[in-house]
Amino acid sequence: CSCNNDLVEYKKNDLKITLEKGESWLHDFPLFLGINKKNPPQIAIWLEDRDGNYLSTVYVTHKIATQSWQMAGKNRRKESLPHWSYSRGVKYDDGLYLPTKKEPFTDGLTGATPHDGFDVKMQPAEGLKQFRVKIEINHSTDFNDNYPKSAQEGDKNYSGGKEGSGQPAVIYAA
């Protein structure tokens, strides 16, 4: 076997975060000539203290962490995971709060964009008794009547243009 399928063992005080694939997990991303590609969501999982201050990132998808978008040109996709981006508070030379290709995100676990549900195991830092787990999930080109592809930059419902997000990201907190 070319892979190692070790079982993950959980100990006292470990935290398991489970994201389950729903019917809209894979989304049609238009390529060209009416051809679509099944596109999984972008995801970030991070911790905040009880006052809402960012502590650390537990997991973020590889594409946003490294800016390795396909067919995005120079669009850094600032609409992809905006709450996570701003929560980190790291402003880059171009004024955006997103990692760059030259300065990728390396502080946490990054992974390929999952095509299925997955689990994340977390061991809270020593002494960290109370915290909030946040999860932000977003799909590219998830347009609707309120967030149309035709919205122009400057419009209140603009979400990145024809390859933007469409609807805003969904954020969960526990």
Please describe what each predicted stretch is.
Residues 14, 40-44, 130-132:
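Exposed beta-strand and adjacent loop surfaces of beta-rich binding modules
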Residues 35-41, 77, 153-156:
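Short, low-complexity, polar/charged sequence segments that are solvent-exposed and flexible
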Residues 147-174:
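Short beta-strand elements
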Residues 37, 48-148:
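Structured domain cores in non-transmembrane regions
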Residues 1-8:
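Bacterial Sec-dependent signal peptides at the C-terminal "C-region" and cleavage site
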Residues 7, 13-15:
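Charged alpha-helical initiation segments
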Residues 15-38, 63, 143:
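Short amphipathic, basic-aromatic surface patches that mediate peripheral association
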